Amino acid sequence: MKKYILIITMFITTISFTSFASYSISEYGDVFFEKNADELWPTASIAKVMNVLVALDEVDKNNISLDDEITFDRETIDIKGSHIEVSLNKKYTLRSLLEAELVYSANNAAYAVAKYVGKGSIDNFVELMNKKARKMGLKNTVFYTPAGLPTSITKMPLDVSNAKDLYQIAKYALNDKRILEWSSKKSIEVDGNKYISRNKNLGFYGNIGLKTGFHSISKFNMLAINNINGTNIINITLGDDSANIRFIEQNNLAKNVS
């Protein structure tokens, strides 16, 4: 396996990628391609992966359950950007909201989860996100919001990370079958409405999930897991100029490992 990886690495480092940052690395740490992987960049909605990880920590501690029912207040319903259609004070399971975060990048779901797990406080939840980041040894990752929304909406600084830290987040997520199950879904249904995955690469070149991200400052980001020849490869692209370019760049990284 080591010899195989070396050959591939030597080949793809001659290829040009247009993303601000690109990082292709196996779950075992074998690097296939690296560009600006240490440089800070806004996470955008990739922050939702940490949101889900924190919520699942509380589930695993038996503090909450995936079957717990959560209601939306008016403030949360009105969260801008990508969202699911919900009704005031209607109950939605925690499981369905976590799925909505990963599959459809629903900002209102992310804020509802944050308020529920944070016992009514978004700030408390974001501190849990940062506490987990520190515990994971992520020295270049800071969260200010539970969903990765831009300053123009939140009035907070941008959530930031770099490709190497995002690799660690993805590797951690790989150990949780719930995240892999949810992020691999091509669609979900919430309250009778169908929502199609934001990940248009699902099923191509071994793509089995994980999370896209976008706002006007971060541009188009993606944290992907591709199972290639039985090995999980984590491909990270940050700062692409369009959604289409993002998916092409991701496929190019995957193709050069397959």
Q: Model segments located where?
A:
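Active-site-adjacent loops and short helices of periplasmic peptidoglycan-processing enzymes
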Residues: 17-164, 174
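Generic marker of residues within folded, mature protein domains
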Residues: 13, 33, 60-62, 216, ...
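Sec-dependent N-terminal signal peptides
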Residues: 4-13
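Penicillin-recognizing serine hydrolase domain
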Residues: 19-28, 94, 118-258
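Catalytic-site microenvironment of enzymes
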Residues: 4-5, 32, 255-258
